[in-house]
């Protein structure tokens, strides 16, 4: 048994014909080939749809440790789809992932993903179900002929860093304590309801005293 994490180093006493029970991994090269062939078969099967699958939203990682990073999420919220003017049932049929459980907790995330949906919709080549009778929103014959299968990720997420010029640190910035401010902000958010309730009760008591 291989040592796992920070535990005691094992000293196994092998008996019982242990050579027969050795786990081998000689099937890995064949597995690699099998996975590759499966990917190619899927790409042929879903063509001309993108190989990478449906469009995913831009989300922030959870917790204070990772919330500065953005990555691809599971699916767009119903609020984002509504703002972009796309029906939630139609969205899945045109290559947009939908996750009804996710919630928008900031207007910034909502605007970013709505814009992403609009850009995707403008670039999308939608094949008509009946070539003889195309519906509203379907692409023209010329656009359909131009269509090729996308091999990379659909609208890859670009992480942009704003470069700032070097400058002197001000006295105000030197005095600023980021950790204490974050703790205070969290405490204020946590105690908001209790403080509001106490203030309301105090105001009611003042009114009663004046009577």
UniProtKB/Swiss-Prot annotation:
Supply the alphabetized keyword list.
Answer: Cytoplasm, Ribonucleoprotein, Ribosomal protein
Signal peptide span per the entry? none
UniProt-listed Pfam families: Ribosomal_L13e
**Quick one: a GO cellular component term?**
cytosolic large ribosomal subunit
UniProt entry tagged with the keyword Cytoplasm: yes
Write out the annotated subcellular location: Cytoplasm
Which GO BP terms apply? translation
Disulphide bridges: none
Q: Which domain of life is it from?
A: Eukaryota
- Which InterPro entries does UniProt cross-reference here? Ribosomal_eL13, Ribosomal_eL13_CS
A GO term, aspect molecular function: structural constituent of ribosome
What is this protein's function? Component of the ribosome, a large ribonucleoprotein complex responsible for the synthesis of proteins in the cell. The small ribosomal subunit (SSU) binds messenger RNAs (mRNAs) and translates the encoded message by selecting cognate aminoacyl-transfer RNA (tRNA) molecules. The large subunit (LSU) contains the ribosomal catalytic site termed the peptidyl transferase center (PTC), which catalyzes the formation of peptide bonds, thereby polymerizing the amino acids delivered by tRNAs into a polypeptide chain.
Q: What is the similarity comment for this entry?
A: Belongs to the eukaryotic ribosomal protein eL13 family.
Q: How does it assemble?
A: Component of the 60S large ribosomal subunit (LSU).
UniProt xrefs under HAMAP family: Ribosomal_eL13
Q: What is this protein called?
A: Large ribosomal subunit protein eL13
- Protein encoded by which gene: rpl13
